[in-house]
Amino acid sequence: MAKQIQAIRGMNDILPTQSPLWQKMEAVLRSSVSAYGYSEIRTPIVENTDLFKRSIGEVTDIVEKEMYTFADNNGDSLTLRPEGTASTVRAGNENGLLYNQEQRLWYMGPMFRHERPQKGRYRQFNQFGVEVYGIGTADIDAEVLMLSARLWEKLGISDHVSLELNTLGDPAERAVYRDALIAFLEQHKDALDEDSKRRMYSNPLRVLDSKDQNVQAILAGAPELMDFLGEESKTHFSQLRELLDAVGIKYTINPRLVRGLDYYNRTVFEWVTSSLGSQGTVLAGGRYDGLVAQLGGKDTPAVGFAMGLERIVLLLETLELNKDIPSEVDVYVTAMGDSCLVEAIKIAQELRSALPNLKVMSHCGGGNVKKQMKRADKSGASVALLIGEDELAEGMVTVKHLRNDIEQQRVARSALGAFLAELAIK
């Protein structure tokens, strides 16, 4: 027997038993962004490597360690996209969507990062994101947070997530703070772990995000960015908090929250959960006013967020919110003998036309009644339709209920659609 080929480590299949939960989640995401008037954008999976070096930052973990990068036949350096924001900005600049315009966009699709696979974190993962361009005021920051809160409400997990909020100020304020933070870290250099020592000069704000407990103890005495903000940044953050308070969105200010990408400024946020252990962040984002110009466009304010969908699915499963997913099949149509096969197939087609929301599966492959009933039960259908010679002769169909104790019934073929609609099969 030939050796089986396995999936690449960290790149997982979504199997038929899992896909209904994904479909339900994706439907919630689509309906929620639609309610806010956002438009979908779809970008290529492969981009020029420079796009991510210029946007994410050359000294970030993503660019240094995690990107899937290769040379094509022309010698160009290409990369499988590790996140969605940079591609959205590139598409907006290239197609004239962002020049003196407001855009509210959303996207959903696979991303790729070569990191250590673990529960809720994979090398190919699906990301959903929202991006807004052309609005620089705090009210749009509040809107994207309101939208994110709506997602949790619609998914039924509002009680299991909490919002953490911070501001990074503008680039000039952050530069002054950066110098102060480096000076502080230099005083404690010998006590820092190797990762923090490496980041201390190249990306010192990322030290604030260290998972090392000893480093966090040292950082308790570090200067706080809030003390380095100018009036404009303080006002923006104050207005955002006021709007969130007005609509009842609770939050905690986390002065250590920085985000892992270089392009953020002012507002940054994360929704976190305690239900997934160490992988607690389920959605993250913020404002990135300089990125559009950094990638060749005009100065354009921007704000957005992204969420890894595998982690949301894991949270739904952990909270056992995947139990009420409807079956992929409502009605299973059987033919009691070869002479009935043609009419059974015709009946199935008639039902699909008359009741387009009804999920109808026809039995194929022959077999006796016992085999067909076994297949019907395994399909998850609520009812099976038995079509034999007696039924055809009388213009009837036998309806067998598979999920309750109702006795089987004979229904006129002409009334079958109305009968099944009245059953309100879900």
Curated annotation (Swiss-Prot):
Cellular component terms (Gene Ontology) = cytoplasm
CDD domains, A to Z: HisRS-like_core (cd00773), HisRS_anticodon (cd00859)
Q: Give the reactions, separated by semicolons, that this protein catalyses.
A: tRNA(His) + L-histidine + ATP = L-histidyl-tRNA(His) + AMP + diphosphate + H(+)
Q: What is its main location?
A: cytoplasm
Q: Where in the cell is it found?
A: Cytoplasm
> What Gene3D superfamilies does UniProt report for this protein, alphabetically?
Anticodon-binding domain, Bira Bifunctional Protein, Domain 2
Name the SUPFAM superfamilies on file.
Answer: Class II aaRS ABD-related, Class II aaRS and biotin synthetases
Keyword terms of this UniProt record: Aminoacyl-tRNA synthetase, ATP-binding, Cytoplasm, Ligase, Nucleotide-binding, Protein biosynthesis
A GO BP entry is: histidyl-tRNA aminoacylation
The enzyme's first-digit EC class, named in words, is ligase
State a single Pfam family of this protein. HGTP_anticodon
Protein EC: 6.1.1.21
Entry GO MF terms: ATP binding; histidine-tRNA ligase activity
Quaternary structure and interacting proteins, as annotated: Homodimer.
Q: Which family does it belong to?
A: Belongs to the class-II aminoacyl-tRNA synthetase family.
**This chain belongs to which protein, by name?**
Histidine--tRNA ligase
Look up and give the organism this protein is from. Answer: Shewanella baltica (strain OS195)
Its lineage opens with: Bacteria, Pseudomonadati, Pseudomonadota, Gammaproteobacteria, Alteromonadales
